[in-house]
Amino acid sequence: MDVIELVPRLHFIRLPVGHAYLWSDPDGLTLIDSGLPGSAPLIADAILRAGSEPAELRRLVLTHFHADHIGGASDISGWGEVEVLAHHADAPFIRGRAPGPAPDLADWERPSYDQVTRQLPAEPVVPPRVDRELADGDEPGFGDGAVAVAVPGHTPGSLAFYLPRHRILFAGDAAARGPDGRVMCGVFNVDRAGAAASFCRLADLDIAVACFGHGEPLTEGAAAAFRAAAEETRA
């Protein structure tokens, strides 16, 4: 696991599968996503390595219902006064009240999807609570005016979070960064057309720092990279 300060107040937590991010406000910490089941101790250690205490965590925002994003949420939500937030359309899946929909895979995605699913641990997700359900345009209460951006397609209730004052985007799995460094629309989507439209919507934002659920964060040229990728997606 790596813990890297991307810009002041923002740390990147590289987990064994997927990523989490830690944002610091004067009144406490916000965690974006929580990794696979069993990730809570790793994230607690990451918070310490970032110079803070797990007890300072005030909210956990979940970008969508997949296990590599909500797996640690049940444990983390018990650390103290931690509010758990997610989009209303994914909330039933996160709470475990309904099974989440499977992706509509393109033929070229199937080998990668099968490989990824074989590598995931068998430990089941303990469904966490969701304290607050969000919709597009809601303010989750961190980052000097962060805004929830609905990006349906990867899942019905996928969310990104945009911090206008800091020009930081937490894209979840609505976007990704490939091994070659290129920004791309996320894969394994329940609605491929919807995912492409949501990705293009993100490209309209003024982005200085882009944080992905999979792939390295982008701290230079993010806006141009998104615009170029969106043009290819629309073509």
Language-model-derived ranges and their functions:
Residues 9, 23, 33, 43, ...:
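Divalent metal-coordination and catalytic microenvironments
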Residues 45-47, 74-78, 98-101, 166, ...:
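Short, glycine/charged-enriched secondary-structure capping and boundary segments
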Residues 83-85, 226-235:
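Core catalytic region of metal-dependent phosphoesterases/phosphodiesterases
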Residues 2-50, 160-172:
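Conserved beta-strand hairpin/beta-sheet module of binuclear metal-dependent hydrolase folds
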Residues 40, 48-135:
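Active-site HxH/HxHxD metal-binding segment of metal-dependent hydrolases
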Residues 1-8, 116-122, 142-144:
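Short Pro/Gly-enriched beta-strand edge/turn motifs at strand-loop
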Residues 29, 36-38, 122-132, 138-141, ...:
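Metallo-beta-lactamase
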Residues 24-26, 113-117, 175-180:
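Short, basic/glycine-rich phosphate-binding loops at helix/coil junctions
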